[in-house]
């Protein structure tokens, strides 16, 4: 992989890494809420999704480490917003679905296009593949929310 130094892809990978890392922790917190409310299956699915997010974060982090290897250790600053939402299980499922939708529908396709334009086809492919997974996560969270409400 060529160097990520000075690229927008570097910034996008770091944003994605931070976002996936935070989603993992949010879902772990949401699992505890679901468990306390008696939604054992939903708690399990939140934890399963948290593990998926860990794998996504790891993939993005590995791209960063490989593309910045000449500069390691290094500090890369980013400016980005991340969701903060905590409520009951229905509210948490709604927030989780919204976060997943933003990733697959907006962020990752945009990040993939930038990576492709900057000559990082493997990074672009990873963004698109992970976007597919995030879409399935959104669908699952919506269905679980609807099951509780109905």
Listing of model-derived features with the role each one plays in the protein:
Residues 1-150:
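Non-heme di-metal
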